Regions:
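Conserved glycine(s) of the Walker
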Residues: 136
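Post-Walker A helix-loop "phosphate-sensing" segment adjacent to the P-loop in P-loop NTPases
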Residues: 146-156
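Auxiliary tRNA-acceptor-end handling modules of aminoacyl-tRNA synthetases
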Residues: 1-109, 114, 119-122
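Short loop/turn elements that form and flank the Walker-type P-loop nucleotide-binding site
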Residues: 122-123, 225-227
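Hydrophobic anchor at the beta1->P-loop junction of P-loop NTPases
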Residues: 127-131
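ATP-dependent NMP and nucleoside kinases share a basic, alpha-helical "lid"
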Residues: 233-245
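Hydrophobic positions on the alpha1 helix immediately C-terminal to the Walker A/P-loop
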Residues: 139-144, 159
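Conserved nucleotide-sensing/catalytic segment adjacent to the nucleotide-binding pocket
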Residues: 156-158, 165-214, 230
Length: 245
């Protein structure tokens, strides 16, 4: 609480356990009727219900996601920065730059191991990257491409954004605004056509989306996949099963 700007805090208790929580909590656990909690890995899994049916969906383990979360937790403990308070201590001590450089070194090492795994699998032609808007997908794809190139492959970063349909045809959300994040905003048919053509050894003129005009353009961006070539494809729907067929 050293860095808090207010002198009062709310403490919550249940039986003999008391703790601080960063948000508001219900007056009693009796309000919480629809949920599931069970041991998972070295912790617990807490599941919330569907907002309409109030039913808790069947649990489907996301092993890669849990591995990533565990790695992040382990890094925080190793650097002794596993809480916001500890992070504030580092900043107050003027060690921000050292922390950033250390984190970058750890991340680059992880990217290198990922690249080595891709190379060792041998027959990979597609590397798919997904994440929400402004999460660093493009930056990550380029960093991964550098590591792949250092291991003898010829990576070609591709942005799914270049497969947007013309802006005039883009779906709108419930507020009437253009919805660039829905799968329907992408020309899935064209994407599948181009990828299949590349896999069959044909030369493809890849599109480039002009965000100023809101239209797709072709600028002699030709590509033919060779033996050591690999496509590094990134976008919001990079891991969406409905993207490919």
């Amino acid at each position: 609480f050293y860095y808090r700007r207010v002198s009062r805090v709310n403490l919550y208790s249940i039986e003999n356990f008391e703790d601080y929580f960063y948000g508001f909590m219900v007056p009693s656990t009796g309000y919480l009727q629809y949920y599931d909690v069970f041991p998972y890995e070295d912790g617990f899994m807490l599941q919330f219900p569907d907002k309409d049916t109030r039913k808790v969906a069947e649990f489907e383990p996301a092993k890669k996601l849990f591995y990533t979360l565990k790695t992040s937790r382990d890094w925080g403990r190793m650097l002794e920065i596993d809480t916001i308070g500890a992070l504030n201590d580092v900043i107050a001590a003027g060690k921000t730059q050292q922390m950033l450089l250390t984190q970058e070194a750890l991340f680059e090492d992880r990217i290198g191991k990922l690249a080595q795994q891709i190379v060792s699998e041998g027959d990979r032609k597609f590397v798919m990257i997904a994440g929400p808007s402004s999460s660093g997908k493009t930056t990550f794809s380029h960093r991964l491409s550098i590591q792949l190139a250092a291991r003898g492959l010829n990576p070609y970063p591709i942005q799914l954004d270049d497969y947007y349909i013309d802006r005039a045809l883009c779906p709108r959300d419930e507020d009437g605004k253009l919805d660039f994040e829905c799968l329907e905003s992408l020309d899935v048919e064209l994407f599948n056509h181009d990828m299949n053509e590349l896999l069959s050894g044909k030369t493809v003129n890849l599109p480039i989306f002009n965000f100023k005009t809101g239209k797709r353009e072709y600028r002699d961006n030709y590509l033919t996949l060779g033996k050591e070539d690999v496509l590094v494809i990134e976008g919001i729907h990079g891991l969406n099963d409905k993207l490919s067929y």
